[in-house]
Design a protein with these regions (language model features):
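NAD(P)-dependent short-chain dehydrogenase/reductase
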Residues: 1-12, 16-25, 29-112, 135-143
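Residue-level signal for the nucleotide or nucleotide-sugar donor/cofactor binding architecture
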Residues: 93-96, 130, 230
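First extracellular/luminal loop
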Residues: 1-19, 246-268
Length: 323
């Protein structure tokens, strides 16, 4: 695992050093160059989408396969885990619904082949931009009106993002990570019983949440700080060349997107459904099965000693003891 993490970090640093936000974008650029150099006389058309999110209209509004970039960030914001995220408030988050991308690919494939490489960028930032601050406002409003409920059956109030620098957010998360780690180490050296055991479990849960938040900031922070705009002139020229009949079937004009309608009424409900989060108070106040089992195991009235009599796991025959 250590070797894998070091290789990932090396790839990320290499990509950053030549202007790419991560190794993913870097390898896509390398792939384009490789295809261009080896295509010989084969016609080549490259379609470059920006950040792909759920569908605008087809096959149904909100269709998406798996989670993309924004969904984990949105869910953790709704859960109260991610209270801050870096970014430039007036910056542009360049997202595009998946059905516009698929329609553009079909339209490109139907064109007469050219001897030159043709590039179509399927993006929204240069012709129908949505500001990061506006997207954050939509998300804040949505979770204010449709809150996620916690384990105690209480609605989670969404935080208001202030968009500090990425370095500041990472420092805050790493500091919290360190403090929780120290608390965990201290408590695990003491006999675990009753309320103390529940505190240890809560610290571990919180530590896991901080780890995830830090991962999202590290992975996606550069995307929301990027101020690049991608020209869609070729895409719009292709769109204008279509018949009205084709336009009604293969929609890929980014200017047609109503961002409030898309984000608030289509994408965010999809994220909630896919995330399977609790969006209403439970009818019963009973504890969850996992909470009941944990309480039973950690009951202060219980005593447990575990022995490794065959001496197969560790050198000592007493693994742990509670009394």
């Amino acid at each position: 695992r250590w070797v894998k993490n070091q290789m990932v970090e090396a790839g990320r640093n290499r990509a950053n050093s030549i202007g790419f936000p991560d190794a993913y974008a870097f390898t896509k650029a390398m792939s384009e160059q490789a295809v261009e150099e080896t295509r010989s006389q084969i016609p080549l058309t490259i379609v470059r989408p920006s950040i792909i999110e759920s569908s605008w209209k087809s096959p149904t509004s909100g269709w998406i396969r798996g989670f993309r970039m924004a969904e984990p960030i949105i869910l953790n914001f709704g859960k109260g885990t991610l209270k801050e995220f870096p970014g430039i408030p007036e910056g542009i988050i360049d997202i595009i619904p998946v059905d516009l991308v698929s329609s553009a690919i079909i339209a490109c494939a139907a064109q007469e082949p050219s001897s030159d490489t043709t590039i179509y960028q399927v993006a929204s930032g240069s012709c129908n931009p949505i500001r990061i601050s506006k997207l954050a406002d939509y998300v804040h409003k949505f979770f204010g009106e449709n809150p996620i409920y916690d384990e105690k059956n209480q609605p989670i109030a969404p935080a208001k993002w202030r968009f500090p620098g990425r370095g500041r957010v990472e420092s805050q998360l790493r500091r919290a990570q360190g403090l929780l780690g120290q608390a965990e180490q201290t408590l695990t050296k003491l006999p675990i019983r009753g309320r103390q055991a529940m505190i240890v479990a809560d610290i571990q849960n919180r530590k896991d949440e901080i780890d995830k938040a830090l991962e999202y900031v590290t992975l996606y922070g550069k995307y929301v700080e990027c101020e690049a705009l991608y020209s869609v002139d070729n895409l719009l020229t292709l769109w204008d060349s279509l018949s009205e009949e084709d336009k009604s079937v293969f929609l890929f004009d980014p200017r047609s997107i109503d961002w409030y309608e898309y984000v608030y009424n289509i994408h965010l409900p999809t994220v909630i459904t896919k995330g399977r989060v609790k969006t209403s108070p439970s009818k019963s106040s009973a504890k969850s099965r996992s909470s009941r089992l944990r309480s039973q195991v950690l009951d202060s009235q219980r005593q447990l000693a575990v022995f490794d009599l065959e001496n197969t796991l560790i050198a000592s025959n007493v693994v742990s003891s509670w009394s």
